[in-house]
Amino acid sequence: MESDLTYYCDELRHLVCLPFSVANLHRMAADLGLKPCWFHNGGGGKYPHYDIPKRRIVEIQAKCKVVSGRDILRIIKGTYGVSSPDALT
C-alpha cells in the first residue's frame, strides 16, 4: 500500500513528513523501518522529528524530498510553503 505521507529530510539527517503530526511521524517511521529510539522530541517537545541513522542515509534520502534545515523547521512549525514574511526567514 502506498503511503499518503510525503517524507522530507535535510543534510543533517533530520526526517519529518507532511501532513505533519507526531502520529504521522511514527507512521512514517514504521513505513521506513525506523526504530522508535531514533525519534527526537527536541526543543522541549517543540521540534519532534526522527534522525536518520548514518548507515541508512542514502536509502532513506532516496525516498524523501531533501530540503534545508530551515524547511524542516517550517514543516514542524506549520509554515512550510506559506507565503508570509515569517516563511521567508
Language-model regions, residue ranges each:
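Catalytic phosphate/metal-binding cores of nucleic-acid and nucleotide-processing enzymes, i.e., regions
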Residues: 1-89
